[in-house]
């Protein structure tokens, strides 16, 4: 087994606490509403949203795969940090054991925030992670972030 690390950052004009509430804490409800072209629904399979919770994320028809199951590993309300692992479905299977993800939302001096994202692809055997896979994951994250950001800009009273 190998581990391939990928890190990226994305900035937003939304304050860190507000982004954490909307994108992380209420993302299961908000994201399918604001980005149905990317995620059709999220089902809570087990747990209360904290560590150990299992969620099934369903994708719309025509998407490369039907679903993924995520396991919540950590929710840090003080430091706006969220860790989860993709444990089933989607790219996980013959070549990947899991994908561990960490999202940390940090306030910026201008009142916005930066999302620091770390992805660890745990491969099976000697398999390597393809650049297209990383690119698709980054594009999906950017799509979801911008959809949430647009919603928050249009609804200034939400998630304060």
Curated annotation (Swiss-Prot):
UniProtKB keywords: Allergen, Cytoplasm, Pathogenesis-related protein, Plant defense
PROSITE patterns in UniProt: PATHOGENESIS_BETVI
MF terms in GO: abscisic acid binding; protein phosphatase inhibitor activity; signaling receptor activity
InterPro entries in the record: Bet_v_I/MLP, Bet_v_I_allergen, Plant_def-hormone_signal, START-like_dom_sf
Localisation per UniProt entry: Cytoplasm
SUPFAM superfamilies: Bet v1-like
Domain of life: Eukaryota
Main location: cytoplasm
Annotated TM spans: none
Binding residue positions for brassinolide: 55, 82, 84, 101
CDD domains: Bet_v1-like
Disulfide bonds: none
Any GO CC annotation of this UniProt entry: nucleus
Biological role: May be a general steroid carrier protein.
Oligomer and partners: Interacts with brassinosteroids such as brassinolide and 24-epicastasterone.
Protein name: Major pollen allergen Bet v 1-L
Annotated source species: Betula pendula
Gene: BETV1L
């Amino acid at each position: 087994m190998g581990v391939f690390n990928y890190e990226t950052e994305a900035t937003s004009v939304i304050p860190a606490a507000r982004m954490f509430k909307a994108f992380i804490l209420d993302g299961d409800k908000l994201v399918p509403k604001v980005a149905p072209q990317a995620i059709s629904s999220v089902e809570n399979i087990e747990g209360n949203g904290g560590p150990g919770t299992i969620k099934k994320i369903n994708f719309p028809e025509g998407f490369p795969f039907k679903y993924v199951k995520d396991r919540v590993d950590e929710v840090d309300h003080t430091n706006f940090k969220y860790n989860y692992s993709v444990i089933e479905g989607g790219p996980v299977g013959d070549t990947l054991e899991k994908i561990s993800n960490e999202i940390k939302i940090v306030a910026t001096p201008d009142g916005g925030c930066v999302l620091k994202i770390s992805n660890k692809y745990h491969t099976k055997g000697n398999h390597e992670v393809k650049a297209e896979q990383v690119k698709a994951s980054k594009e999906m994250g950017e799509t979801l972030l911008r959809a949430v950001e647009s919603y928050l800009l249009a609804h200034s009273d939400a998630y304060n």
